[in-house]
């Protein structure tokens, strides 16, 4: 049995150039010491109900975004409590850390402190059982493994890019691929066709990329973004095989009297502000005109009524991210209100592996879909690739097929696909059936 011997914690930079937490967890078994590393992501568009990401607030250092407080909590509070504990009991260690924090939102120790240790413990637990991480997660969750449909974010807008596009992500989902490797290739080929379309229409300056590797062209309307995707899919030869998804991140453009589709223009005249009802009509028009199969965060995180109306009126996947923040209580409310039909699973929104698994299983029990997700501020850590296979949720979004912190996850899925061989099961058209 491997037990925790010590923890090292450090401040590293994520893909947005901001500090985040990384830990090395040291274990001992039969006199042999091993180490397991984990790093925590962070978001740009964050829901107000997310667990607390503890930052230092010292403006003279990293503009207040340092994480030395979280690191101190790992070394001085969490480490003494977990030394000698078995890494094979993920739930017990997670509960211990949550109890040490004692707040409903992990505001004392920081979700970034707790999660870093939780992820490392999970890796150590897998090694203790001599199992690949994805297989270990499958066993502790009681789920069936399968390879996910990747949702590649290929056009960036909203808070992820400097253009005027209100909605945050325009994605492609290769649901018609026969396996993950083919889906990966389809995504890459559509991405490069999109690059050619954008550069031909807007010039070379337009193919700069956003935080998640997607292009950020100077387009003015959301419909224009959908047209570009449709054309790129056609040029790649994958019409009917590659579908479209959107993450609207509507909480980012919610204003007092509605939703401002021109929110990135300061002091605008308000002519682009529409009601939740009109915004719902816009989404229904998009669904009729384009091969859209998934829309995430179509409304503000507190606009339950608009969510419920849209979900009842369409047959596509409606995903709750800021609405649910991977929180069991918010998920329960969403199920009761029939506000959406899928969860976006972000481990740092809730702050531990055990709670993330619970959120996925609660969603599964409600016949919801579950899409595992990265954050815009990522690291080279590949945990979520193993998580999505182990849970078998059938769908993952972790950016474009571009930028190393995004490709680290996709490339890990290629390796897992290879390891599983003929035993793998690509979600494909059944991606919503978790």
Curated annotation (Swiss-Prot):
InterPro entries attached to this UniProt entry: Enolase, Enolase-like_C_sf, Enolase-like_N, Enolase_C, Enolase_CS, Enolase_N
Catalytic activity, reaction form: (2R)-2-phosphoglycerate = phosphoenolpyruvate + H2O
Any one Gene Ontology cellular component term annotated for this protein: extracellular matrix
A molecular-function term among this protein's GO annotations: magnesium ion binding
Enzyme Commission number: 4.2.1.11
Disulfide feature: none
Binding site for Mg(2+): 247, 296, 321
Pathway in which the depicted protein is active: Carbohydrate degradation; glycolysis; pyruvate from D-glyceraldehyde 3-phosphate: step 4/5
Top-level taxon in the UniProt lineage: Eukaryota
Subcellular localization(s) per the UniProt record: Cytoplasm
Co-factor binding comment: Mg(2+) is required for catalysis and for stabilizing the dimer.
Binding site for substrate: 160, 169, 296, 321, 373-376, 397
One GO-annotated biological process of the protein: glycolytic process
Coiled coil: none
Residues at the catalytic site: 212, 346
TM spans (from-to): none
Main location: cytoplasm
Keywords (A to Z) from UniProt: Cytoplasm, Glycolysis, Lyase, Magnesium, Metal-binding
SMART domains to which the protein is assigned, alphabetical: Enolase_C, Enolase_N
Similarity comment text for this entry: Belongs to the enolase family.
PANTHER family on file: ENOLASE
Quaternary structure and partners: Homodimer.
Protein name: Enolase A
Source organism (scientific name): Dictyostelium discoideum (Social amoeba)
């Amino acid at each position: 049995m491997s037990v925790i011997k010590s923890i090292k914690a450090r401040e590293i930079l994520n893909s947005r150039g901001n500090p985040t937490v990384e830990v090395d967890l040291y274990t001992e078994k039969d006199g042999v010491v091993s180490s397991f590393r984990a790093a925590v992501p962070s978001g740009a568009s964050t829901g107000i109900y997310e667990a607390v990401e503890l930052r230092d607030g010292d403006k003279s250092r990293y503009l207040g975004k340092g994480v030395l407080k979280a690191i101190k909590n790992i070394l001085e509070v969490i480490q003494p409590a977990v030394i000698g504990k078995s890494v094979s009991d993920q739930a017990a260690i997670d509960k211990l850390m949550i109890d040490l924090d004692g707040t409903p939102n992990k505001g004392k120790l920081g979700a970034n402190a707790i999660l870093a240790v939780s992820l490392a413990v999970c890796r150590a637990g897998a090694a203790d059982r001599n199992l690949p991480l994805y297989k270990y997660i499958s066993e502790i969750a009681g789920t069936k493994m399968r390879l996910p449909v990747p949702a590649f974010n290929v056009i960036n807008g909203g808070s992820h890019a400097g253009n005027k596009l209100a909605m945050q992500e325009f994605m492609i989902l290769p649901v018609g691929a026969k396996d993950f490797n083919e889906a990966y290739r389809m995504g890459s080929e559509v991405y490069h066709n999109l690059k050619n379309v954008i550069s031909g229409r807007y010039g070379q300056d337009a193919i700069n990329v956003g935080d998640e590797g997607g292009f950020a062209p100077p387009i003015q309307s959301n419909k224009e973004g959908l047209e570009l995707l449709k054309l790129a899919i056609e040029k790649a030869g994958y019409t009917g095989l590659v579908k479209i998804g959107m993450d609207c991140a509507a909480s980012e453009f919610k204003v007092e009297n509605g939703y401002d589709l021109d929110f990135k223009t300061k002091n605008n005249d308000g002519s682009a502000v529409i009601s939740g009802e009109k915004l719902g009509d816009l989404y229904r028009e998009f669904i009729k005109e384009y091969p859209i199969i998934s829309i995430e965060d179509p409304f503000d995180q507190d606009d339950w009524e608009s969510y419920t109306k849209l979900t009842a009126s369409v047959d596509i996947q409606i995903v709750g991210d800021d609405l649910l923040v991977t929180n069991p209580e918010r998920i329960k409310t969403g199920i009761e209100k029939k506000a959406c039909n899928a969860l976006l699973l972000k481990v740092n929104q809730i702050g531990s592996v055990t709670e993330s698994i619970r959120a996925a299983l609660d969603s599964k029990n409600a016949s919801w879909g579950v899409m595992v997700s990265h954050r815009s501020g990522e690291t080279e850590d590949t945990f979520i690739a193993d998580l999505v296979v182990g849970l078998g949720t059938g769908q993952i979004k972790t950016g474009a097929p571009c930028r190393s912190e995004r490709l680290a996850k996709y490339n890990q899925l290629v390796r897992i696909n290879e390891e599983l061989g003929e035993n793998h099961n690509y979600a494909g058209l059944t991606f919503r059936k978790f």
